[in-house]
Amino acid sequence: MTATALVAGRTALVTGGTLGIGFGIATQLKEHGAQVAVTGLSDQECAKAREAGFSAHVLDVRDREACKKVVADVVAEFGELNVLASNAGVYPQSSIEEMTDEDIDLIFDINVKGTIHAVQASMPELIKSGRGRVVLTSSITGNYTGYPAWSHYGATKAAQMGFVRSAAIELARKGVTVNAVLPGNIVTPGLEAMGKDYLDNMAKSVPAGFLGEPKDIGATVAFLASDGARYITGQGIVVDGGQILPEEPAALDGI
């Protein structure tokens, strides 16, 4: 546990929490004092998460009833649920020209409907806790910038932010805040597979001069889940090393 212990005594559920950014979120919440349950797509993923000290549950967020079952299991184990970090998502590539209905349905079913399912399932417990926190993992893509072959992904991330703003208003008087973290380029196993040269070139496009890590997203989620963020709701917090700023990184050379 860190010295700050932002979420000590709270119980958090992190969907898609067995890998990458999700695992970084789960780890930071745990280090800040929370009891943490994660979900993953396979028994193998969940077994590794349990070895790391997490309660772990197999879940496909497209299944509304399965989401309710996981929440019930978490409450049965820990007694309550205070924090939902809705992180489960996919980011397949496809050009607009080649995109099929199946491609579109898959990404919207997971990134948008799956997010809503997780929030719906968690709401009764979050409201009951009196200090509920919902934090979505969205993206700068679709909200501040765009990339070729990810137009459908960007559309889902913009939709998530629309959900955040309206859900924040709907739940504000019920003691629940709803926010999102919008990551820039974060080093995950998928990105590392692109190779060192690719990562080095990507880092040069970021004013900070380096790529973020899952723990950077996790630390932001831990803050948004804390009492220190009680007056923050309906917001998207960008964590990108200055990536969306208009200044050309080359202009920083020599400074």
What is each stretch, according to the model?
Residues P124, I169-E170, R230:
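Alpha-helical segment proximal to the catalytic Tyr-Lys
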Residues S95-I96, D103-F108, M202:
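Substrate-binding pocket helix/loop in short-chain dehydrogenase/reductase
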Residues A180, N201-I232, V239-G241:
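C-terminal helical subdomain
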Residues V119, T156, V164:
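Active-site helix of classical SDR
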Residues T11, T18-G20:
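Conserved glycine-rich cofactor-binding loop
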